[in-house]
């Protein structure tokens, strides 16, 4: 085999491995397989509350998002956090790991352990949810009136995984 042929072959072999960035360890779900991956468009809702030192600060309240697959609405995401599929299946999660978003304005990537299931359908076997590829969602600015609410647009991808 000539060098002219060997170099492109090596580049082809190395290409996909180099292009695929692994998830941060804090949100990886080793040994689990993907059940469903969806895109979400929505808002992170914040409330102005007194913080630990008595000063007013924005506190995360809840997400409100539409879950999309191939441009079609297939579910929703809301406080709990809950993810509800159009087939009636739903899961509730609890954050167990996080990693920073790409930009300062991006909410963090999360790993959530499923703590409850409802209904039967595509989400029935889900054990873990990952929130990745976040864009936006963090609130910046002054908070000066307790009880005030603000919504910050965000998008993310949610990956639903099962054991094995």
What positions do the PLM features span?
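Hydrophobic h-region of N-terminal signal peptides that target proteins for export
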Residues: 11-19
């Amino acid at each position: 085999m000539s060098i002219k042929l060997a170099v492109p072959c090596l580049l082809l072999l190395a290409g996909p491995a180099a292009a695929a960035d692994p998830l941060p360890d804090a949100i990886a779900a080793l040994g689990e397989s993907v059940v469903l991956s969806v895109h979400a468009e929505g808002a992170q809702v914040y409330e102005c509350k007194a913080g630990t030192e008595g000063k007013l600060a924005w506190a995360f309240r809840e997400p409100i998002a539409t879950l999309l697959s191939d441009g079609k609405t297939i579910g929703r995401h809301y406080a709990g956090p809950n993810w509800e599929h159009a087939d009636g299946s739903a899961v509730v999660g609890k954050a167990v790991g996080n990693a920073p978003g790409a930009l300062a304005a991006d909410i963090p990537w999360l790993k959530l352990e499923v703590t409850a299931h409802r209904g039967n359908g595509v989400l029935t076997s889900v054990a873990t949810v990952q929130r990745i590829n976040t864009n936006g969602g963090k609130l910046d600015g002054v908070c000066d009136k307790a009880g005030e609410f603000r919504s910050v647009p965000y998008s993310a991808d949610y990956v639903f995984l099962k054991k094995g």
